[in-house]
Amino acid sequence: MATDGASCEPDLSRAPEDAAGATAEAAKKEFDVDTLSKSELRMLLSVMEGELEARDLVIEALRARRKEVFIQERYGRFNLNDPFLALQRDYEAGAGDKEKKPVCTNPLSILEAVMAHCRKMQERMSAQLAAAESRQKKLEMEKLQLQALEQEHKKLAARLEEERGKNKQVVLMLVKECKQLSGRVIEEAQKLKDVMAKLEEEKKKTNELEEELSAEKQRSTEMEAQMEKQLSEFDTEREQLRAKLNREEAHTTDLKEEIDKMKKMIEQLKKGGDSKPSLSLPRKTKDRRLVSISVGTEGTVTRSVACQTDLVTESADHVKKLPLTMPVKPSTGSPLASANAKGSVCTSAAMARPSIDRQPSHGDLIGVSVPAFPPSSANRIEENGPSTDSTPDPTSSTPLLSSNAAPPTAQTPGITPQNSQAPPMHSLHSPCANASLHPGLNPRIQAARFRFQGNANDPDQNGNTTQSPPSRDVSPTSRDNLVAKQLARNTVTQALSRFTGPQAGAPPRPGAPPTGDVGTHPSVGRTSVKTHGVARVDRGNPPPIPPKKPGLSQTPSPPHPQLKVIIDSSRASNTGAKGDNKTVASPPSSLPQGNRVINEENLPKSSSPQLPPKPSIDLTVAPAGCAVSALATSQVGAWPAATPGLNQPACSDSSLVIPTTIAFCSSINPVSASSCRPGASDSLLVTASGWSPSLTPLLMSGGPAPLAGRPTLLQQAAAQGNVTLLSMLLNEEGLDINYSCEDGHSALYSAAKNGHTDCVRLLLSAEAQVNAADTNGFTPLCAAAAQGHFECVELLIAYDANINHAAGGGQTPLYLACKNGNKECIKLLLEAGTDRCVKTTDGWTPVHAAVDTGNVDSLKLLMYHRVPAHGNSFSEEESESGVFDLDGEEESPEGKSKPVVTADLINHANREGWTAAHIAAAKGFKNCLEILCRHGGLEPERRDKCNRTVHDVATDDCKHLLENLNALKIPLRISVGEIEPSDYGSDDFECENTICSLNIRKQTSWDDFSKAVNQALTNHFQAISSDGWWSLEDVTCNNTTDSNIGLSARSIRSITLGNVPWSVGESFAQSPWDFMMKNKAEHITVLLSGPQEGCLSSVTYASMIPLQMMQNYLRLVEQYHNVIFHGPEGSLQDYIVHQLALCLKHRQMAAGFSCEIVRAEVDSGFSKKQLLDLFISNACLIPVKQSPVKKKIIIILENLEKSSLSELLRDFLAPLENRSTESPCTFQKGNGMSECYYFHENCFLMGTIAKACLQGSDLLVQQHFRWVQLRWDGEPMQGLLQRFLRRKVVNKFRGQVPPPCDPVCKIVDWALSVWRQLNSCLARLGTPEALLGPKYFLSCPVVPGHAQVTVKWMSKLWNGVITPRVQEAILSRASVKRQPGFGQTTAKRHPSQGQQAVVKAALSILLNKAVLHGCPLPRAELEQHTADFKGGSFPLSIVSSFNSCSKKKGESGAWRKVNTSPRRKSGRFSLPTWNKPDLSTEGIKNKTLSQLNCNRNASLSKQKSVENDVSLTLNLDQRLSLGSDDEADLVKELQSMCSSKSESDISKIADSRDDLRMFNSPGNNPVFSATVNNLRMPVSQKEVCPLSSHQTTECSNSKSKTELGVSRVKSFLPVPRSKVTQCSQNTKSSSSSSNTRQIEINNNSKEENWNLHKNEHLEKANK
């Protein structure tokens, strides 16, 4: 047993070990049970179950088989021989309580413990198995879901591939279509090019054809002239032969008469015997009836004299009178007339056969046929004054007078015996006097000539214009010559009479105009003809035959003959009518200018007057087909009758008839024919200065228009303003100046109606009836007032015209003037005291008439114009009282003055019951209705006969006006509280802005008033924060309550109505209208919440920074305690920080804390010790031993960019970031003692840096602060300037938003674009230190109507701020990589010539691209202000060479590196506006610690020297080279700026041809010289093109196609024309517009050169 027990003991000892190992193994497996797979879990389970079963079997076996061993083991050691064993056995057996432990180990207890442990393990295993099964089920489900997702994924992938395939096909199709379309575009472009080429060819062909056509016309004209000359020569020769025959016949007749007389004398002698008769040989001059005198200009001059005898012939045969021709010398006196060219003319007229006019040739002697007349019972003189042609002689080298003049001669009557019969007539020829006005004439004659000459370009009666050759007068020929006019008017008779006297002067000059012939006309049916000043006949008509012209009798002229005017009667048939043995002479209608005088006593009057147009003096009426000769000649004598052999009534007895017309006309205007019969002509030749083509409508008809009697002629002269004719007619005796025609129009009426003030004055002086009315009752004053002729009105009123005369319909002059809107006439009538209340038969008043036409000025005059007191002129009264304003300005005086008219007149109703207000409202004349509404007595509720009020008939606009009739217009203003005027650059922020005017009506309630205030504020906020120029009406459709800047009605702190506080929604007992009237509230002020209330709404409105961003900045300060605001200079950092500090202070005070703001201004001398003292003295840094303070401290550090951040703040970074006693920092005090300090939580630190970005060692500070960057191209700075300027415009326009086309909007948009483009260009240049914030542009002046003020302000800003900053930045930029010997400071003090040139180029480009571009001023005005901008002209063509090989490959982008040293900004260039004096504000301890030490002074002097160096003009004689690589980079950057398409285009500035020049540079010089010579491009060279952003000129480095080896390189630098340098003569400038394509010149190199040459010599020099 013992042996067995011993043998079994190891098994017992191993069993617990196995159990322990199994437990450890199970524990190990339990740890990883989650990661086992299903098969492993099954294996583990089976193993564990088998082990359990095995252990159970072992236990049972041990219990059954080894019982004895257990007993032996327990009790076998005890035997009776050992007392100690006995005692142990007794102890164990005798112990009754179970608490006694066995002496030895009990295996059963061990076994039971093992079994209990195994049971626990089994339970745990089963639990784990159940969990594993659940997880397995979950895993299976997830696998199923995964499979489903994978299937779905496969489907989606397939669909995606399918879609990709489809998209690929679509893309291919699109690419194919694009290629096709591009091909089509190219084809269309080619077609267009071909078509344009064809068009150019066609144009060239057309031009050639036009030139050939003009040449043909000229040749045909020459041939025609030659033909006419030949015809004239032929005619002349024929007439000369005929004249010779007539002379021979006359001589034969004289000889026969002498023979007969001698026979009679012999017979008488024989009969008389002793008595001797005293009869002497008769002379021809006794019997001479007609003498024709001709004075030629060249060669031999013949004088043709026609004589008539007393021969009485009973037969019907024609008796031919032989004229006498004698040679005469050319006149040594005036070329106008011979000294003895006097003559008397017979009064009898016979019929001459018709002939055809011919154009005479120059210098020919032309005889004029003169008919022979029987003696008549009365003496009669007819004379035509000679006139001359205006066509300059082509052979003459001297300029001719455009309107030449020749004086006519006056004759005394010749005494002739009577004949009872009129023998047939035959013709006699005499040459015309060739006359041209000599410069040395009498001034009176010249005055008459100036007055009477016609204007060749005045339109004729048919609306046509006759052309005359260009005037080349030696003497003045203006018809408006006042002296000549006055002399002509006052001395007509004297001037005319002087024409007949002998004129002393020089002989006729060569090249005078040719002479002209006058003759009868053929019978042609046309009634009008148009002739030209150039002598030529119409093609298609036969050339005219020279007319037959009577001569002049050689009888002396009376000194002052009586003035007579002829008036002929038109005849009904071709034949003349017999009566009283008197023959009426019917002149041919083809006669040229001349005069004809016939006594009109026995002639019937014609009822249809007709006057020629104004430019012509000729009153002769010519039928069509008869080209009136442009060579006007003198004609004297009887007019030939149409049919020979028929007697016509002779002229009535008249002892004295003198000429009345002098023709001074440069061209002959067409006039209507009186008849197509040869004899029935009614032309009148009178002295006339000019004729108006607007009258005598019968002229437009083409039928006969005979001229009637004297009164009708008087009317026509008055109607056409012919002062000279009118004065002559008024001098006649027995003329009825008050004669009225059929419609009752008198001469005064016609003159007043047509506005001829001089005629009105003449007629009134002649005592014409001033109140003579026509058939409708209209007086001359009515006609003048209706037509607006205020000068005539003034004259008529001065002559006591009836100003209140009512016509047939009751129309007064005032009514007619108002009806036609003639305000000057209205003013004159009102000042004369006319009655404003006179009514027409329809019940209309002048007020009705003015309103009916919608004429505001007339209505204002009627209502407000007061009659001036005696002795005071209207202008004085108007200047003193300012009664009325026709310009409609804002503060018009009629709003202050009282209307003159009564309420009865304003409310007077017409026949329909309509008042003036009814008419204005119905027609939509809102302005007139508004003026009527200003009258306190207006009754808008008055009803018409249809029971309608003014409101019922009004249009929508007028209804709105009537509804607001009694409304109070009270301005609504926004106030942001008080702003320190010069603190933090806020002096541009306005405290109050007027946003609109509220209309408060009687029926307005307080709810309506509250809604109106809210809506007005919302509209205003949205309008100023919108992107465009929206009007208030445009934003009302936007229902959002908040604007883009975050302001709304919730931002209101309080509202005051006048001085009474009011809140939205509050109601008073009185209505708003009564309340405003009672309290006399002149304005409504809305006060926005500000920092005092812990809000930032007022700050947002003042600065236009969005409210959300300001609140976010405040949150950052409260959260991080350490915040620094940085951005370009002028980004309002100081203002933002100050306002945030105020708001934070008031918030802390509202929470019960005391708070203090401490401001410190940092400069270059601000040390770390001063900063430490600042922190300690203000209890920001407190000793570790001291307890924290409850006081809040806000520290503001301004201008940190002036100091080194790393040096200044290095020791404070750690304690600022960790504010507790656990992270103290030791600082040494001034006494040398060191102590530990820490920053407490109640301290806030804010700083400002005027720098766009940090550089160098300052970046070490960045991670310890919260940084707020104010970028110029991001909010809030990007839109701040736009919103600010828009609000300024709205305030300037009293709350209204002007339209985008308004000049103010354009100039403001320009200022905004200048700021953006300037910063954009500076950013592209890589000079961030020169960027500008919007603060400098906030002071932009807004002056409506004065855009030049803004341009002047911009020039001051450019010169004072922008230019120095750009110069400093460019110089620092160009000297970054200088050698050590040429450091930055040295470069700044003494910049090289290349650097100066680059600076000037940069300034010029910036000025043209950023500033001047887009300026809305006209170019002329802009050029006046361009000189105010410094640096705008680039005086040198920078002609240095840059080689790519001179620059290392790795340095291509190195130029972009900026200067890392802090920029020391001087206060020299800051505007006075932005100075910040140290003014202590409320609740702020101003502890400015800035020190003006030597460093600042040194910086000032340094900056001053830099400016002086840069501003110096470079020595033009020096040769320049930009030697450094950085300068080359800068040049290329400037070049890319010029060629950039993203920036604004320089070429879009108004044609900058005068301002910008592009230069070529010769390539044979290593360095180009800039000389002072002024460039004057020859005319043959093409005009150089202005600098264009689209033009890039590329040069070749390998080949040069210019002849002398000159590379054609263009400069991209803008060079002003005035200061350009002389270029090589070999260089040529290409002409191009600013929009041309790129010019490629030997484009073998892709590198663009900016006036640079690749030259090895320069490279070596640069090295």
Swiss-Prot record:
Compositionally biased region (Low complexity): 386-403
* Repeat region (ANK), residues: 709-739, 743-772, 776-805, 809-838, 842-871, 912-942
Top-level lineage group: Eukaryota
Identify the keywords attached in UniProt to this record, alphabetized.
ANK repeat, Cell projection, Coiled coil, Cytoplasm, Methylation, Phosphoprotein, Repeat, Synapse
What SMART domains does the annotation carry?
ANK
GO cellular-component term (any): dendritic spine
Name this polypeptide is given: Cortactin-binding protein 2
Species assigned in the record: Plecturocebus moloch (Dusky titi monkey)
